[in-house]
Amino acid sequence: MKKWKSSLLGIAIWSLAASSMAAPKELDKVVTLVNDSVILQSDVNAMLQTVRINAAEQNQPLPDDALLTEQVMEKLIIETLQLQQAEQFGIRIDDTRLDQAVAEIAKERELTIPQLQKELEKSGISYSIFREQMRRDMTASEARTIQVRRRINILPQEVEMLAEQLNKQTLQTVQFNISHIQLRVEEGATKEQREETQQQAQQIVDELKNGADFANLAYSYSKGPKALQGGEWGWMRQEEMPTIFADQIKSNGKGAIIGPFRSGVGYHIIKVNDVKGLETVSVTEVNARHILIKTSVILSDDGAKRQLEKARQDILAGRQTFADEAQKLSSDPGSAANGGELGWQTPDLYVPEFKDKIETLPKGTISEPFKTVHGWHIVEVLDRRNVDRTDAAMKNRAYRILFSRKFNEEAQAWLQELRAGAYIEQLGTNDDQG
């Protein structure tokens, strides 16, 4: 039996159970009451049989029969309780979602759906029962997820602390090529002199972000130890840097400008010239502007489209500006006040049709009218830029780790509470028939 078949343990269990229930036996009986549901002897026997088959094929030891039966019974009780919760929440897994899940399983196994059906049949598993057990599993999982999510609270400081730990681990082997400018604040300087130096440092940062040459500014202004080398410190790991540098450099990518920041001797500015060994995350942001016209009982799709076509022609002909037309026509009050401008955003923020337009439209081109769920639009891409999101990606990773930890803890607690609050009566099983 292929490895993947072991992951279908639950499916096989219910397939075998269905087979045994298809030919009723006198010995089949209710063995456990779980609130208003029942667990049958055939359910227990089917699961015991399947567990033993899988254990034998994988050469795994099993506990004695009494303990194994107890474990099987507990699994059936927990599943029943979760399905009862799902029914209370009105959770239903429709055929479309089920089809997608089955297709995903087939894809993971590098099989087509017909091939998956044949593999199941070879193992004695009915495809229809396979689908229904998947529906049960998905239903129970969704009920569990809904309830457990409500119990999880992740504080921002928890994310920050874990992200910092992850970042330190990541940076142990990373090398940075950095340059540095130091503006000295003399001992005994007045408040006005300190503020003047701070303003000068900020002005230098602004110039650097607008493309000024770092080395030239270092020659002109820096009082640091590498001023005569254009401020360049070369390649260093974080642990090799002066502490004041190491404290500021996190997961900064190539080209990052850091500062100005203060120390006991003055203000500092760092540029990351290059990085070795750091996996950075970069995203493209788009600054676009649009005009949205929503349809209504008095404005049809054709009417909205014609209005935008006329506005587009007026803008292209120079008779109107985009900003004026947006303020006059747009049904999006937030952007209309800004001449239709949406600001810097990642395309993923938008609905699919709008996302596709701003990803493919050449800069400075006004699109033809197109429709989304919000209405009819014309859009112009003003500019694009690549933005380093490594720090945000690290925080996202930290959040996911914390969520996973807490979810597992809270899921166990929820299941225990669910079981403790349920009416469960075990009527006793027959002698093991396996």
Curated annotation (Swiss-Prot):
One of its GO terms (cellular component) is outer membrane-bounded periplasmic space. The PPIase activity resides only in the second parvulin domain. The N-terminal region and the C-terminal tail are necessary and sufficient for the chaperone activity of SurA. The PPIase activity is dispensable for SurA to function as a chaperone. The N-terminal region and the C-terminal tail are also required for porin recognition. Residues 1-22 form the signal peptide. One of its GO terms (biological process) is protein stabilization. It comes from the Bacteria. Residues 173-274, 283-383 form the PpiC domain. The lineage of its organism: Bacteria, Pseudomonadati, Pseudomonadota, Gammaproteobacteria, Vibrionales. The gene is surA. This is Chaperone SurA. Chaperone involved in the correct folding and assembly of outer membrane proteins. Recognizes specific patterns of aromatic residues and the orientation of their side chains, which are found more frequently in integral outer membrane proteins. May act in both early periplasmic and late outer membrane-associated steps of protein maturation. One of its GO terms (molecular function) is peptidyl-prolyl cis-trans isomerase activity.
